[in-house]
Design a protein with these regions (language model features):
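Catalytic-pocket segment enriched in acidic/His residues
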Residues: 8, 12-13, 175-354, 408-411
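Short beta-strand-centered aromatic/proline hotspots
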Residues: 16
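Intrinsically disordered, low-complexity serine/threonine-rich segments
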Residues: 270-271, 356, 364, 379-382, ...
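Long, compositionally biased low-complexity repeat segments characteristic
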Residues: 349-368
Length: 411
């Protein structure tokens, strides 16, 4: 099944199920209000979500509405844990050779992994906001797994049993801050800003045999400012699988439901996955007679640049929807009259969506918007769905209809 989190003005959004053709969606609030709630009680909740997905696909769902990716947050807008590996041989070896010169003997003895920030994930169309352009802004296309509760010391052979969902990731990196941080031998912090996600989180069965051996054998494509930068198979060129990453992360700790583990930058078959790889190749190609790397030609991203990351199945269909983000200056995002350290707070997309047509014939929805400012964003999304009812594109809001209109619960 395909799951998303819709913007409603809250931190965690509202869980919804999306049809396999990506044309319609259905709120899952009668089953689980948020993605994290579903993950917390997966064995009970997942069958109910699957039944709702089947109803949506067969036309039997009671309250479908048009699926609009722009209304999505990250599938998990904030997670208990974000752990990122680096399993692609080409990515690691290119960067190591260009910037360190020598590959250490123990490079592939065990997986590499860092713990990143997980409290402020970016949705698929959210601006990627940075304070300084000269920090070396770079994208990194990755695949990830979302886990259920995973015990400490889980065996590699059992690790994949704890995978609940697959996701597509843009692990933003600030390359010019990395060397100083790693030089302190204390890991990444400032060089790893908020991570972006595609709208859909999917169960592994959605890609069939492409989920094999602990890897997702999907095509991953990156466009930078509308020009194809990379297209590669995410299932080849790896030294480790997700099973090994999970077992590595759980060696000394439990991994709680909602933990996300990333693959590291997809890079294979000579297709560089990020700007740093391209620069590394340029530097190595310009090496002097002693083998010292020369100067790279390609600059990192600038304000106004845009990156689009998407994964495709064997038939060419999008799997997770697209990440489509624009690099934006923090200074340009400040609201007029705001204090020097106060970033602009944008209107929730759901609220803007709901207010796009104020001439609603659904007076109950309009009254709800007017009367309850404390929950205006959530009411707005519901009013928008109710507005679609008036034009024949959806069915009325469950909460307005009463408990009988809630989705049937399996079991």
């Amino acid at each position: 099944m395909k799951l998303v989190t819709l913007k409603d003005g809250s931190r965690d959004g509202m869980l919804a199920v999306v049809a396999r053709d990506l044309k319609t969606a259905h709120l899952a609030d009668g089953i689980a209000p948020t993605m994290q709630r579903a993950l917390d009680d997966w064995n009970f909740i997942a069958p109910q979500l699957e039944e709702l997905s089947l109803q949506l696909g067969s036309g039997r769902a009671r309250r479908p509405f048009e699926f609009v990716p722009a209304n999505c947050m990250a599938p998990l807008p904030r997670a208990h844990q974000w752990l990122d590996g680096s399993v692609y041989e080409q990515h690691v070896e290119l960067l190591t050779r260009a910037f360190s010169g020598k590959l250490p003997d123990n490079l592939w003895r065990e997986p590499m992994m860092y713990q990143g920030g997980s409290d402020d994930f970016l949705g698929p169309g959210d601006a990627a906001i940075f304070a300084e352009e000269h920090w070396g802004i770079d994208f990194e296309p990755e695949l990830g797994v979302v886990l259920g509760d995973t015990p400490m010391q889980v065996r590699r052979d059992d690790a994949l049993d704890h995978v609940r969902l697959l996701v597509l990731v843009n692990d933003w990196s600030l390359r010019n801050l990395i060397a100083a941080e790693l030089g302190k031998s204390f890991g990444f912090l400032q060089s790893k800003p908020a991570t972006g996600f595609a709208p859909l989180a999917i169960t592994p069965d959605e890609i069939g045999e492409a989920w094999s051996g602990g890897l997702a054998h999907l095509g991953v494509a990156v466009d930078w400012n509308g020009v194809r930068f990379m297209a590669a198979n995410a299932g080849v060129g790896t030294r480790f699988t997700f099973a090994e990453l999970i077992a590595h992360a759980a060696r000394t700790r439990n991994l709680r439901a909602g933990t996300i583990i990333g693959s590291g930058t997809v890079s294979s078959g000579g297709n560089v996955g990020c700007i740093a790889e391209l620069r590394a190749r340029e530097a190595l190609d310009a090496a002097d007679e002693k083998g010292k790397p020369g100067k790279a030609r390609t600059d990192y991203m600038k304000y106004g640049d845009r990156v689009r990351i998407e994964a495709f199945d064997g038939g060419g269909s999008t799997v997770f929807g697209a990440i489509d983000q624009q690099v934006t200056s923090l200074r340009r995002r400040r609201a007029p009259g705001a204090g020097a350290d106060e970033p602009e707070i944008a209107m929730p997309a759901a609220l803007a969506f709901a207010q796009a047509d104020t001439a609603t014939s659904d007076t109950a929805a309009a009254d709800a918007l007017a009367q309850d400012a404390g929950t205006s964003a959530a009411s707005a999304l519901r009013a928008a769905i109710a507005e679609q009812v008036a034009t024949g594109s959806a069915i009325a809001d469950a909460r307005a209809d009463g408990p009988d209109a809630l989705p049937p619960q399996a079991g």
